[in-house]
């Protein structure tokens, strides 16, 4: 599935002129020789285009896809369908007519050999041209005499028939492909990617650009030990991929990885994405939606576009109409010595992607401190909430990044390791950040558990719920506020000493911290004391029934942490408003 999608993307890029095909290259072309159906030269057309170079505007050759060109030294070696005037016309203005004739003879031999028995008017016209063209009479040809001076300055020429470049003719392209295939002695196999018969790719091209992999490139498909082989096959014969498919998927993947604007790294995973058809506008919207990246447009514009696409409406984005039903792909790769591991591969419609991502961010939505200016928590920052920043290598667990992204893309349950990592950091640091509270909320909204009910999984403080673990978290925040009100310059609070025990074994802690609160309140002014007395009474007296529980389960601890976070943020919000 991965290789098939990449091969299709390669062909989309090829159709858009963004990438070269096997046996082809992008070359600078200055002139087009227009032939009639009989191979007679009718006209010479300049292909130069105006181009800005600094403050100057100059004429520059255009870029065309042409058959792959040879690497010349000092010998005579002709190119197919695209070459200079010495090879295409037998003239060069360098005062060496004998060498120009040799070049033309080499080009004639090459073209007649490749185009022999090729059907179609284009192939026949080119053959007739080389058979009938007389280099000695070239300078007197009416089609050339007006442009000889410019022609002698150099530049490549191609053939043009009926306003179509000859190298674009399907029958000629097939002939050139057959010529390229002759250069391999690989056995013919049924390609498992295309389903067509093709020469076997014994070794696949290297993939470059994956963070942490070898700089020279790594392989997705490789067999370098007998233990990996079966039925007597060697190397690529164990997974028969044709040379074209191997070239195509590698070209497409290297193209994606080279586009650094649309590559994201999370943990050890390098992520690329693409849309069927090859338009980069889809990648830009998807990357911003998934990773909360800085977009060249406003946050509101991105949200409006995503909202319309989620509801099945097309959107104009950077002069491209985004289709919500367009097939979209996301691939995560991780380094593994000389190979690459596929962390995940996702494919569905663009609408499904954005819908799943939007649901993820909706679950993460939670009240945030006034100083926090980020409306969304990207995947990178979520994973950082599981990291010990004081460690030698502060990075998330390698497998976690792939597991979390897979859950987001598929709108499935979050991995338990995400919650475990967050709870571990809270216990170690006694610090409940916006990110950690948001993860707990999102986790239990998706991974439903009655011990952490939806009534406590709210954006802001829920004053109506009577769920005991959540209310105890609220109460703990109030008791901490009392201590801080009496001792505003205090460095450590009851949170630093008692938070872990209060969240896991409340019966052992709450009697102590309630007694401490009463002592602190004796130092308060009367209005302040009345205010906090009412808060404690509303929570401890009105909602907590009986004694404090001896132990809280992990989901109940999550509810406790959310209660504490919500109540704390409400206190800070009131201070900001005041």
Label the model's feature ranges.
Residues 1-189, 228-578:
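Conserved phosphate-interacting/catalytic interface
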Residues 194-196:
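Short Cys/His-rich metal-coordination motifs, predominantly Zn2+-binding knuckles/fingers
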Residues 200-202, 339:
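Short catalytic/ligand-binding loop motif for oxyanion handling, primarily in non-cytosolic enzymes
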Residues 202-238:
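Short microdomains enriched in Cys/His and/or Lys/Arg
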């Amino acid at each position: 599935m991965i290789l098939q999608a990449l091969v299709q993307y390669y062909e989309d890029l090829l159709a858009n002129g963004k990438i070269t095909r096997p046996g082809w290259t992008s070359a600078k072309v200055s002139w087009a020789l227009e032939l009639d159906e009989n191979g007679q030269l009718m006209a010479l057309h300049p292909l130069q285009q105006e181009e800005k170079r600094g403050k100057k505007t100059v004429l520059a050759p255009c870029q065309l896809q042409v058959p792959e060109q040879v690497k010349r030294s000092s010998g005579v070696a002709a190119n197919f369908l695209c070459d200079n005037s010495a090879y295409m016309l037998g003239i060069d203005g360098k005062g060496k007519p004998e060498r120009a004739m040799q070049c033309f003879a080499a080009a004639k031999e090459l073209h007649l050999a490749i185009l022999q028995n090729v059907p179609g008017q284009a192939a026949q016209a080119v053959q007739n041209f080389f058979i009938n063209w007389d280099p000695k009479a070239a300078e007197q040809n009416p089609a050339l005499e007006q442009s000889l001076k410019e022609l002698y300055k150099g530049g490549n020429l191609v053939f043009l028939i009926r306003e179509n470049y000859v190298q674009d003719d399907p029958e000629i392209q097939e002939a050139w492909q057959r010529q390229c295939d002759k250069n391999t002695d690989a056995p013919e196999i049924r390609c498992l990617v295309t389903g067509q018969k093709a020469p076997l790719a014994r070794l696949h091209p290297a993939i470059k650009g994956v963070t942490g992999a070898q700089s020279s490139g790594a392989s997705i498909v490789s067999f370098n030990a007998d233990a990996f082989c079966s039925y007597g096959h060697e190397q690529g014969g164990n997974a028969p991929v044709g040379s074209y498919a191997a070239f195509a998927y590698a070209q497409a993947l290297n193209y994606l990885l080279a586009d650094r604007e649309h590559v994201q790294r999370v943990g050890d995973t390098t992520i690329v994405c693409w849309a069927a058809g090859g338009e980069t506008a889809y990648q830009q919207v998807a990357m911003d939606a998934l990773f909360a990246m800085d977009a060249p447009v406003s946050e509101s514009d991105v949200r409006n576009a995503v909202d319309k696409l989620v509801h099945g409406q097309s959107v104009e984005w950077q002069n491209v109409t985004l289709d919500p039903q367009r097939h979209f792909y996301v691939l995560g790769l991780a380094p593994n010595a000389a190979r690459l591991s596929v962390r995940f591969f996702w494919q569905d419609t663009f609408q499904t992607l954005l819908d799943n991502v939007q649901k993820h961010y909706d679950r993460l939505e939670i009240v945030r401190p006034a100083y926090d200016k980020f409306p969304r928590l990207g995947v990178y920052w979520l994973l950082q909430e599981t990291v010990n920043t004081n460690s030698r290598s502060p990075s998330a667990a390698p497998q976690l990044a792939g597991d979390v992204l897979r859950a987001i893309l598929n709108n499935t349950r979050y991995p338990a390791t995400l919650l475990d990592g967050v709870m571990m950091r809270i216990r170690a640091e006694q610090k409940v950040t916006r990110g950690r509270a948001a993860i707990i909320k999102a986790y239990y909204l998706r991974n439903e558990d009655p011990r952490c009910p939806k009534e406590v999984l709210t954006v802001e403080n829920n004053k109506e719920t009577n769920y005991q673990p959540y209310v105890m978290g609220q109460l703990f925040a109030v008791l901490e506020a009392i201590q801080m009100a009496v001792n505003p310059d205090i460095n450590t609070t009851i949170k630093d000493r008692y938070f872990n025990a209060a969240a896991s074994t409340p019966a052992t802690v709450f009697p102590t911290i309630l007694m401490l609160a009463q002592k602190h309140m004796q130092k308060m002014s009367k209005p302040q004391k009345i205010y906090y007395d009412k808060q404690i009474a509303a929570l401890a007296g009105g909602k907590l029934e009986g004694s404090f529980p001896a132990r809280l389960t992990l989901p109940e601890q999550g509810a406790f942490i959310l209660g504490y976070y919500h109540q704390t943020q409400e206190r800070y919000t009131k201070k900001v408003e005041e």
